A protein has these predicted regions:
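Classical cleavable N-terminal Sec signal peptides
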Residues: 2-11, 30, 40-45, 71, ...
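Short, intrinsically disordered, charge-biased short linear motifs at domain edges
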Residues: 2-5, 36-43, 89-99
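Short, solvent-exposed loop/hinge segments that bridge or flank secondary-structure elements
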Residues: 15-49, 77-87, 104
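Disulfide-rich extracellular modules and peptides
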Residues: 18, 53, 57, 111-112
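Contiguous, well-ordered beta-strand patches that form the walls/edges
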Residues: 49-84
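Beta-sheet ligand-binding and adhesion/scaffold domains
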Residues: 72-122
Length: 122
């Protein structure tokens, strides 16, 4: 279903579960040392918008390329945050670097019907 969304332009939710791990930039962060979490992404491919969990902020979708949906690709002098969905593999990654601390979230995603964006967001 996720792959079909890329081809025909759909909106859908993704319920993603995985492991969160944090530590100094440059050191290995083994999955077995991480903590479990679940996040819900709401993605509107046609409208090129997305949000997560309570949808406090609806953001523009960064790009769709080579079988990937890049939700966010932000870089500044203090760090970066890149959130990528790999539809064919039903996987996602969310990597944040804040100063000298890296936080990695990764796991699997299951598609659900699109629940829309809150009315109070653009």
């Amino acid at each position: 279903m996720i792959g079909a969304a890329l081809q025909i332009g759909l909106a859908f939710n993704l319920i993603c579960s995985g492991t969160l791990r944090s530590g100094p930039v440059g050191l290995a962060l083994p999955e077995q040392d991480g903590e479990s979490f679940t996040i819900t992404y709401r993605i509107d491919v046609d409208g090129r918008r997305w949000c997560s969990d309570a949808c406090d902020d609806v953001e523009p979708l960064d790009s769709i390329l080579e079988g990937q949906i890049v939700l966010r690709d932000q870089h500044d002098p203090d760090g970066s945050n890149v959130v990528t969905i790999f539809p064919a593999m039903r996987r996602f990654t969310d990597t944040t670097i804040d100063g000298n601390v890296a936080t990695l979230r990764s796991g699997t995603c299951d598609p659900e019907p699109f629940t829309g964006f809150p009315l109070n967001t653009a």
